[in-house]
Each structure stands twice: as structure tokens, then as C-alpha cells.
Amino acid sequence: MAHHDSVLVISSSPDFPSICDLLPKATRQPSLRSGSNAAPVSNDAPAAFTSAANIWQSSRARHLEGAEISNIGPSQSATTAADLATVPAESPIKSGVEGPTLPLGGDKKKPRTAGARKKKGKTETIEPPLALDMAVADGPVAVAPPKKSGRKPRAKKDATLAQTTLPKGKVTKTAAREITKAQKKAETVSRHFTPHTSAPPELVAGPIDDSPSVFEPAMARRMDWTPPRESASVHCLADSSMEKEVSSSALSLQDHVFKNLQDTYGRTMEASGYIGAALPLTSMDVLGKRKLVEMVSCVGHRQEIPQASPTKPKVVKKKPRTITELATAAYRRPEEAERSTLSRQQDTHIPSGNLELPSEQLTAASKSASAKPKAAKKAPKPRATKKKQSPPEPILLSPTSAMRQVSNQDFVFGTASQLATEDDPVLLRALHEAMKVSNQADSDPFATPSPGNSNLAIRRRSGAGLWAAGARYGDGDLLDAEVLDLTRSSPLTLAQFAQNPPPPCPEAVLADKPPVESAYIEIEMSDDTLDLTISPPVGSPKTLPPCPPRPGGQAVRHKDSNLAVSGRPQTPPQEADFDPPPSNQEQHQLLLSQSNTPQQPQPAPPPPPSFELYTDARLAKEVASYGFKVVKKRTAMIALLNRCWESRNKTALGSTAAQAAMSTSAPNQAASPSRPRGRPRKDSLTATTEVVQAPSPAKKGRKKAGVVSGAGSEVPQPEKWPRGRPRKDSAASVSSITAPAATNPRRRSAAISDVDSDEPQVEKRSRGRPKKDATTSPATRATRAKAPPSPKRAKSPCTTQPAPTTPRRRKAPAKQIFEIPDSGSDDPFASSAPSSPDQHSDLFSSPPAVDLSVTEDTEASLIASPTTQDVSLFGYITRAVASAPPTKDPANPSWHEKMLMYDPIILEDLTAWLNAGRLDQVGFDGEVAPGDVKKWCESKSVCCLWRVNLRGKERKRF
């Protein structure tokens, strides 16, 4: 047999010892030296980096060399490096056979004798022969199981490669050169490769006589990592993993061992080939033929499932759960479509672990998977049905139906985080019902300290709800801060007054009192809807004297100002109360019949209010209502308000004669000196109310109409009086009588033009009910009858107008009443200042202030007085500024452009520009003061400043 021929021998001996047993202990290496002290580099030093394999092989070689020297002797220490590496601690028989290999390494024998080089001598080229090309054919390898326990795990990884590389052989190198190369690499031995102390005893070889008996325990030991079905295959797999290369001389001495191994090896070659073919399939699981076929079929069906996957757009519907979704989940019902989709997915889904299912179940699953594309084709049908369900749009409801539907709907208020809580829907509905009831329940109209002396206050108090209770002015105080009357007795509602009528009141109508709801509706009636429709039907008993005041000195306060002044309760509403008012002729007859009725003395003025209970903001408003500047000290404001209130009451008491001179009455009626604060407008309304409540007698000849005033004075009427009521000048005439003396002359001129423009229309309109109601016409007639002559009197031909023919009686719808709010001014009779036409539309004018007393009856008007006095003027200023044409010079923008650019506005310059004729262009006859312009700028949030600063110096920069 040639020297290079090799035979594969399967070894059933145990594995090599562990690496820790083979590697030597870490020896302390000398420290590195540099410079002239550095040791010279050996010629045999390797040029490449040292690897873990080189270190392991070199250390193992050192152990083998030491073992041979101690057991064999110097004559047998010339074995090759390959034999030393593959056959550790061989017997004397093996060492004798290997004698011919001495010439290969004889020249390298001396370097091994050196202690330092003998331990390091091993090259990095020994690892491939150990793993791939060398085969162990001698008996001692199989006889010593503990020697190879650490080697077999490494050889097992390269079992397949060892079979393919057998014919190539291996060219080994001498150990002398390997020792020189390993001298430098031994320094990098890791602590991990330190050998155990029990390694040297295991290197001793043992007898190899009973090699067949050794195979069996080795086979049992390897069954845990080999997957064969027969014991022979176990031998095959276990032995094939250990293939090594030995020389031909060793094979000739071990024929009987090789024969036994060859018989075993020949049987296992067939099994090994079969297993090698089945390796790709056994990588997943150990399966039989039938299971392999079923697995292939499952894979085929699984490929069809992605084709049917377009039916999974339901997964796209999964959206991230938001707080809104969580909040609305309690009100949403589960959709049936989602349930059906989930059930369909569960039925048709085939899990990946169903490889062991029977063929019947797999075929059924394949049928369901094959039927899935059909279901995908039918999937658009449900989408089509959903589209058909979506087009039905809600029917457009009428406003009434829409409001009813909204009132029945539950609204959830709050932020999304609040809505995410798990609240009971029933609790939410109950909460909404309670909120709805609280919003609908308006507060008691009598509970307000102000009876509504002006329509402005009435309209601002539309309904006391949850929002109105917290409404505030711009300066921070409540809109209805004076809801509770702390200085007077508690207010009395109409229902309570009907239940406990005062003894002097003989009105029997209150006995049949209506329910609280009807009285509530009557209370809520404002001046716009009341008019003269509260008159009883013709034929009712004559008007009874008014009831005396309540013990607190107050009359029953209604929302209507005329009822508040009259001082007696109003009868419940009846059907006749809502009929149109009587015609002009019938009204004159009622006025004539009312002129003979006596008047009761009016109650004494109420005591002054306690200003100490007012807040600072309210005190500031009261002071501003009297025309004073802001006072910082609270005590000073209270003292000032007390003096102002006393002066006004004295003026009201002293003006009784003037009021008597301005009103007309029957000859038998005497003036009432106890009337402290009667206003012509309010008194005329009171008289008109009393007259309308009187029965209307049969139509008689025309008589001179008379008007009963609140003062009850007697004044003769002119011979001729127009039957028609003026259209719009009645309110202006009242304001002309009661305007303060300090009124701006521009307003007087506007009122004069207003009277001139309206009087020709009065002459033409002589029949039927005029556009303006009759609440203020009696007062107008009275003021025109006995007012002192003025320039407007000369222009007004109403007193000399001949009486037209008797108008036909016809019913006209009730007109809205635009009352004149109260304001604090100086002298009510000094001069007249009728408001301009725009003031009627804006519900603002300059009414008299003589009757005003700082009580709860007039607090609302006083609070609004700082803003209501100049609202009309502000409207003119706004129109004048906004209607000015834009400038063409960018360097000189218009006033409106300056305001839009937030430029500071010089009040003196803007006032001069407005008075230069700009206000005349917008219909305002007069001039404005810089203070009014400043108020306008502040109301519009316009940046304004004075040209002269507080020190009296003129500003140079703006």
C-alpha cells in the first residue's frame, strides 16, 4: 500500500478529552522588552496573527510530546507531528510501527529537547489534518475512550466535509518548524483554555482487545443527538462523524479491527445515503412519507390563501381608539357586519401548525380556502347595500319641528377627557333634563329691584337663565347685581297679592284669579305688547280708586312701568285685554269720562336708599349718573350720592306746580300736593290706563278732549283739537318738556326739524289709528296746550288745527312702544331737547331727570345712563369716520385708516375734523366735545391721547 494512500476508519471510541484538559496551564510569560533589550525575532515565527486554533493545537502538541517522551523513550520520540496529534499516548506496538517516519522529522529533534521551545512548538497547519484529512485506523484510538471525549464534538461538525476530502490526502509539515512558529503565539493563551489537572492521567493508553464491546456504550451515548430509526443507522451516524487519516503501515497491523469496522461501516453507508437525501425535509420535523405528502399539499393550499386575501379589507377598518370613540361607545350598538367578518375569518383561516391533521380535514380546509375567492367576489354586495343605506338623507324639518327635536336630544358637554369616563347614560339624561328645567324656569319678575323704567332695561333682561345670572358689564360687576333688595321688604308676586288682597281694594276681579301661569304671562308683558290693550271690555264697572301702598311705602312693582307708577295691582288678563285699542273718538270719550273721577293722593316719597350697601362699582356708576367725575374714596361717594338724592327729591317736590300747569283735568278735580315724583310721561300713561279701564259710553257729540295728568291739575282745553294722533312726534314732545337745561343745542335743532317734518303728516292722517300708539298722545296734547311759548311752538300748528271729521272705528294691530329711558340731568324744565329721529330707533334719548331718585325703581336706568346718553352720538361719529373716503396720499392716511393701523389718535385733531362738517354730512347737526370723542374711542378700543399731557405741555412725539 502506497505511503500516501489512506483509508477511512470509523472509530467508536469515546470523544477526546475536553479542551480544558488538553490545554496546558497558563504559564507566566516574560514581559515584553523594547529597544536594545528586545529579543531577536525568530526565523520560525509566524507572520500572521495568532488564532485560538493555533494556540489550542500548540498546547496539545506540547502535551503529546511530553507524554511520548515519558512513556516511549528517546528512541521513539521522532514521530511525525501528524501522528502525535492524532494518536495521543499510543502503545509500544504503535510506536514501533511508526519507526519509518523518523526521517521526516529527525532533523528537528534537537529543538524539541529545549524546554522553552518544546512547549511552544506547533504550527497552525495541523488543524486541517485533525478535522478533515487524517483518519485514525489503529486500535489504541478505539481502546481509550476517555482520551478522545473532548475531540469528537469538534470532529462532528466537519463529518460531511471529511467524506468529500478523503482522496486528496494530506501533506503534513515537520514539527520543528511548527515549534518555532508557536514560540511567539503561546503568549496569547486565554484563561478559557487552561487545562484541568486530571488531563495527564487520561493520556495513558489501554488495551484494545475488546473493541466490539466498546461500540455498544458509544452507540447508546450518541442516541440523544442522532435521529435514526434503527440501531444500525445510529452506528452509521455516530461512526461517520469520526473520520481520520492514518498511514498504511498502521492499517496492515489492524486488519481484524478494520474488518469489523468495515462490516459495520458497509451497512451504514446505505442508510447514510438515504438520510442525506432526506436531510432537507427533516430540517423542519421528523416526518413519514405520508406526512411529507400532506405537508406539500398544505403548502399548495397555503399559496392559494393569499389570493383570497383581498377579502381582508375589514382589518383596515381598525382605527386607533380615541377618547371620543370610548366616550361614544356606550351609545353605539355593535355592528353585525363586523361580527360576520370575524366569524368568516375564523372559519377560513388555516393555522400553520395543522400539518398533522388528517387528509379529510385538510381537504375540507382546502375547499373552504378555494371557496374564499367566491366570497371575495360577493364582498362588494354588502358594500353596495351600505351605499344604498347611506343615501337616505334626513328630511328637512320645519323650524318648530327642528327645535322640538333638538330639545329632546341629549347633548354631552365637556372636554374629551371628561367624556371618556364611564358614566351611565341614564344619569346623563337625567342631568340634561334638570338643566333644561332650570334654564326654562325664569326668575320671578317681581324679584328684580327695578320695575323696568326703560325699555332698554326690559330688553336686557330677556330671561334670567344660567348664563344671564353670570353676565357682567365691562367693568366687572354683574349685569343684574341688584336682584336682591336689601333695603326694602321682600317683593310681592302677583299670585301672592291676589291671594291676600289689601282691604281698601274693592276689586272683585281678583277673587277669580287666574292660575299662576296666566299671571306669569301678564308679568312678562313689556311695554311693546301692553299698550292700551289692558283696558277692560265695554260695560265693565267703572274704574275704582287705586289701592293704598304697601306697608313698606311701595306700590306693587310690575315689569311694566305704567303699572309701577299707578300703584295698584293689575287685573288678570282676559280675552278683551288682547283686543286692539279703541279708536280715537272712543278714546276721547273715555278721557272725558275719566276727567270727572277723583284722584287719590299719592304716597310720600320713599326714604333715601342706603348707599352703604352698594358696591364700589355701583357707587361709581351712581356718581357718574349725576355728572360727577370718579371719586376714589367710598365715604366721599356715599356722601355725594346722599346730597344728590336729597336735592333731586326737593326738586321733585317743588315741581308739583309746574306739573299741574302742564296737565289738564276736569274743573272739579283738585291738584294733589303730595305727588313727589310724578313724571309727565308716566303720569299720562297712568291716566290713560285708568281711562281705558273705565267703561266706554255710547257715542255722543264731539267734546273737547281732556287729559288727566298725574298731578291732577285742571287746565282748560283749546277749542279745536285734531282727532288723529301724531305719528312720531309724541315722544319728541314729551322729551321737549322734560329735557334738561344743559342739553346740547344740536339736539334741540334736530328735534325742531323732526317736529316740522312730522306735522304735515299729522294733518293728512286724520282717520284711523296712527302709527304711534296713544300712550303718550295725551301727554303730548297737554304739553302743547299749556306749555310756555317757545320757538317750536311757533312752528307747530297743532294747537290751531281744525278738527277733522269723525273717523271710522277700526281695529289696528298693536304697535311697539319706544319709551324714553331715564337719565340724570340737571333741570327738567329749563329747556326742551327732543331727540333726533335716529334716537327713536335706537331707543335712546335725553329724558328728564327731575323725577329720578336713587331707588330700586331707577337703578337699572342709572347703571345704563353713562352708555345710553352717548350711544346715538357714537353712532354718528362711527358713520362719519367710516364713511370718509380713503386718502390717496400714503403719508397722510385717513382717520379710519389710522385706527385700522392702530395709530394713536389725537383727540383734539379728531374733534376738530368732526366739527368741521363731517358730522353734518352724516345727519348730525351740532358739535362734539373732545371728551365725547374720547369716550367713543374707548368704546371702540381705539388708541387715543391728548395733545397736551398731564403737566400741561404739548406732546411733540406720538
Swiss-Prot record:
Stretches with biased composition (Basic and acidic residues): 332-341
Compositionally biased tracts (Low complexity): 364-373, 655-666, 775-787, 821-838
PTM characteristics: Phosphorylated in response to DNA damage.
Annotated Polar residues bias: 342-351
Residue numbers spanned by region Disordered: 89-123, 183-209, 326-400, 531-589, 594-613, 655-849
Predominant subcellular localization, coarse grouping: nucleus
Compositionally biased intervals (Pro residues): 600-610
Protein's cellular compartments: Nucleus
Family: Belongs to the SLX4 family.
Protein name, as recorded: Structure-specific endonuclease subunit SLX4
Subunit composition and interactions: Forms a heterodimer with SLX1.
Function text: Regulatory subunit of the SLX1-SLX4 structure-specific endonuclease that resolves DNA secondary structures generated during DNA repair and recombination. Has endonuclease activity towards branched DNA substrates, introducing single-strand cuts in duplex DNA close to junctions with ss-DNA.
UniProt keyword annotations, A-Z: DNA damage, DNA recombination, DNA repair, Nucleus, Phosphoprotein
One BP term from GO: DNA repair
Pfam family, any one: AT_hook
Gene name, Swiss-Prot/TrEMBL: SLX4
Protein origin, superkingdom: Eukaryota
GO cellular component: Slx1-Slx4 complex
Biased composition (Basic residues): 109-121, 374-389
Gene source species: Chaetomium globosum (strain ATCC 6205 / CBS 148.51 / DSM 1962 / NBRC 6347 / NRRL 1970)
Molecular function GO labels: 5'-flap endonuclease activity; DNA binding
